[in-house]
Amino acid sequence: MTTPLYWQTEGEGSDLVLIHGWGMNGAVWQTTSEKLSQHYRVHTVDLSGYGHSAELGCADFDEMVKQVLAQAPKKAAWLGWSLGGLIATKAALTSPERVSQLITVASSPRFSAEKGWRGIKPLVLSQFTEQLKTDFTLTVERFMALQAMGSPNAKQDIKLVKKAVFSRPMPDQQALATGLMILADIDLREAVSQLSMPVCRMYGRLDGLVPIKVAHDMDELMPNSAKIVFEQASHAPFISHNDEFISELRTFLNQHA
């Protein structure tokens, strides 16, 4: 039997799963889940190799998706931030009967930039991979700074993310390396048109990792999905614009309940 992932569940109501991004853990949702738990039964997970699931070590992309599905509620709305958006999207594609609504935050079906598609330059991803080998704590901190870049409250945002992440065990080094490979290699662009449940895509207009051009390109790939852009936010709108984020999320979930 596989060792279970670490989950936190709070609140009552319809089920909502929250999935963190690369280098992070479920504590990053603390303020968000406290507020959402007044309306929903909120489930936050530490992915394999992260936070309280760090000792489980590394898992590849498909295995990560299976691990979350194995312990998630039978049917729930799934919300994934950044790398977590890829995992939530893949879960919705492989097990659509389990995902009632899909929400992606500062995410993309293809994170790596290529001709005709905006994203993270492959060189940046390979530099992070190299830095991991020498100082993975510093690498995670640099990624946090990159996430907040552009936000008017960048310093405060980084402080909040750091506090959350460092409140739990540091991620497994190999899990971090595998996560960067996922960001570099996974491409779900052709698959997303198959999604049948209501989908909401949330973006920060100032995001340096998922450029706003991606939001417009996704309008063509997913014409039936909802799109929300937080004008003054960067890569973590649920941290920099928490009340606005929760209001938009609740509106979408209520419309598609």
UniProtKB/Swiss-Prot annotation:
Its EC number is 3.1.1.85. SUPFAM superfamilies: alpha/beta-Hydrolases. Keywords: Biotin biosynthesis, Cytoplasm, Hydrolase, Serine esterase. The keyword Metal-binding does not apply. The lineage of its organism: Bacteria, Pseudomonadati, Pseudomonadota, Gammaproteobacteria, Vibrionales. The active site is at 82 (nucleophile), 207, 235. This is Pimeloyl-[acyl-carrier protein] methyl ester esterase. Its main location: cytoplasm. One of its GO terms (molecular function) is pimelyl-[acyl-carrier protein] methyl ester esterase activity. It is an enzyme of class 3 (hydrolase). Monomer. Substrate binds at residues 22, 82-83, 143-147, 235. Gene3D superfamilies: alpha/beta hydrolase. It holds the Pfam family Abhydrolase_1. Belongs to the AB hydrolase superfamily. Carboxylesterase BioH family. InterPro entries: AB_hydrolase_1, AB_hydrolase_fold, BioH, Carboxylesterase_BioH. Pathway: Cofactor biosynthesis; biotin biosynthesis. GO terms for biological process: biotin biosynthetic process. The physiological role of BioH is to remove the methyl group introduced by BioC when the pimeloyl moiety is complete. It allows to synthesize pimeloyl-ACP via the fatty acid synthetic pathway through the hydrolysis of the ester bonds of pimeloyl-ACP esters.
